């Protein structure tokens, strides 16, 4: 499923990610999902990184889409643990 971030140039996407660690951490989780054939996973992110997630997923999709996969995410409402939000990451074959 396409979203408004899919057609933004990669350099613009990367410039909009304030916390580069969340990008690296999310990419690591996505990679582990493929290795273990797990296509969804819960993942905790700092509350201040919430705004970055659309850009993080768009950047990851630039890398994995040519290999037949697409990542997405969904926020789990009202799940806040010590200032971290729980999100649900998805990895779909396309």
Question: What are the residue ranges of the model-derived segments?
Answer:
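Acidic, low-complexity, intrinsically disordered interaction modules
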Residues: 31-90
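An N-terminal amphipathic alpha-helical segment
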Residues: 1-50
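Short acidic DE-rich linear segments
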Residues: 93-94
């Amino acid at each position: 499923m396409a979203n408004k971030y899919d057609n933004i140039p990669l350099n613009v996407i990367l410039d909009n990610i304030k916390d580069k660690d969340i990008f690296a951490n999310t990419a690591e989780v996505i990679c582990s999902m493929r290795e273990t054939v797990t296509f969804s996973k819960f993942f905790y992110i700092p509350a201040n990184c919430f705004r970055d997630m659309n850009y993080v997923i768009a950047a990851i999709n630039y890398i994995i889409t040519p290999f037949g996969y697409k990542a997405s995410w969904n926020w789990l409402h009202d799940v806040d643990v010590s200032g971290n939000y729980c999100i649900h990451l998805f990895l779909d074959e396309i």
